[in-house]
């Protein structure tokens, strides 16, 4: 499944940086009063973080459980998980699992991946009016639409590593903000790009 990545921080530095940055982001969202409740969904079955991803996100969950009353931290340990919001079902994964996949899911939907996703939808008897399959891994924005579901790729918040630049092109960094209405098909979506000098 996974591949080794060069690190420019020790494990301790990476843990500290991740915890501080994520808690800072959650605190800014919470104090902005942007929503009545904040849910943070973490996909930890991936080819990057290993057990570190679970441990770091569990530490954040423990902290948030003791600090905030309206912040929920979900940690997805299976490769693919889904949740419902109104007429929507969101199916989420990293795009490449931590153990079995030789290659990750593609940027553009292909017949093999489409069949795989349709089998997941059928297995879990997902009947939602709007189904969105969301993933990362390739650090690039991508969108395909089929009759049964949308296929969405998100960029990475972090700058691309040397490995990503070599294998996936010199991608951009940032995040996607989505506003989803419970009963409408298309979310309002805005991509926020971060210049490396801003980090």
Regions found by a protein language model. Name each.
Residues 1-66:
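Core catalytic region of metal-dependent phosphoesterases/phosphodiesterases
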Residues 61, 72-77, 86-91, 96-196:
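Conserved beta-sheet core of the metallophosphoesterase superfamily
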Residues 11, 31-34, 41-47, 175, ...:
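Charge-rich, low-complexity terminal tails
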